[in-house]
């Protein structure tokens, strides 16, 4: 089992670099940095991380091919690979409609866009002259002026078609899920995609990009996770909620509370233990270890400790290192 950790560059880059260095010291394998227009730039942040760490792999978790042209993404991640001494990984997904609506960007044909973008980025990274007349991605003899070496590409994927595509074309897949029930479905879709193109499914790094909250006090861990879990519930397809026995009405109540900024209700009772169980890896080190082992048994090969990580971020990173990574 590999271990990653996610940081959101709402914090200054040097603060994230401190946490990344601490994560490296605690045995984490990957640091993933989110990419949203309203936070600090992902590649600027990754540059700071590259200069302040030595061995941990660093990557975007995840960028997309709507706000950034694939040629620009290829140049950016190739630069990170060069600065970091070959430690860069690229996380690329379809993005999210709410962000694109806010930016005035049309979200068209995400499956075709993602597939074509990955092919173009691979060709750019390999030093090829790229000429494509794809359904969504088009180039006419574009080429980077430098070679990057091999950079693994991970796909952010949720739905069955995206998961199947990840099995076909990606080195890894970043799945926003925390529960074995969701990975039973996801692993099968990835396997289907891999076998379609003659790949060994074990070549794909199946990553649980999870809401994670750890503390020796389980109540503190749960309280830290509630707001993040609320947003997950509000954005989950009804089919996923049904899988976990959560009603559409409960989803609506949580969505309404978020829209009103009523976080007191979320902390009070709207976010139930059932939701915490379904949509997070949460609790004491022993609780988290049990869930990780359950996920490993299904086929998960990397755990990413995503927001909030814990009520005290520094303490949580050290707890994961000492009580989970060291023992696995």
From Swiss-Prot:
Family matches, as InterPro entries: F420-G6PD/mer (IPR050564), Luciferase-like_dom (IPR011251), Luciferase-like_sf (IPR036661), MeH4methanopterin_reductase (IPR019946)
Leading EC class: oxidoreductase
GO cellular component, as recorded: cytoplasm
Pathway: One-carbon metabolism; methanogenesis from CO(2); methyl-coenzyme M from 5,10-methylene-5,6,7,8-tetrahydromethanopterin: step 1/2
Keywords, in A-Z order: Cytoplasm, Methanogenesis, One-carbon metabolism, Oxidoreductase
Catalysed reactions, as listed in the record: 5-methyl-5,6,7,8-tetrahydromethanopterin + oxidized coenzyme F420-(gamma-L-Glu)(n) + H(+) = 5,10-methylenetetrahydromethanopterin + reduced coenzyme F420-(gamma-L-Glu)(n)
UniProt-listed Pfam families: Bac_luciferase (PF00296)
Molecular function as annotated in GO: coenzyme F420-dependent N5,N10-methenyltetrahydromethanopterin reductase activity; oxidoreductase activity, acting on paired donors, with incorporation or reduction of molecular oxygen
Entry's Gene Ontology BP terms: methanogenesis, from carbon dioxide; one-carbon metabolic process
Gene3D superfamilies (alphabetical): Luciferase-like domain
EC number: 1.5.98.2
Protein's cellular compartments: Cytoplasm
Record function comment: Catalyzes the reversible reduction of methylene-H(4)MPT to methyl-H(4)MPT.
Family classification: Belongs to the mer family.
Record protein name field: 5,10-methylenetetrahydromethanopterin reductase
Organism for this UniProt entry: Methanosarcina mazei (strain ATCC BAA-159 / DSM 3647 / Goe1 / Go1 / JCM 11833 / OCM 88) (Methanosarcina frisia)
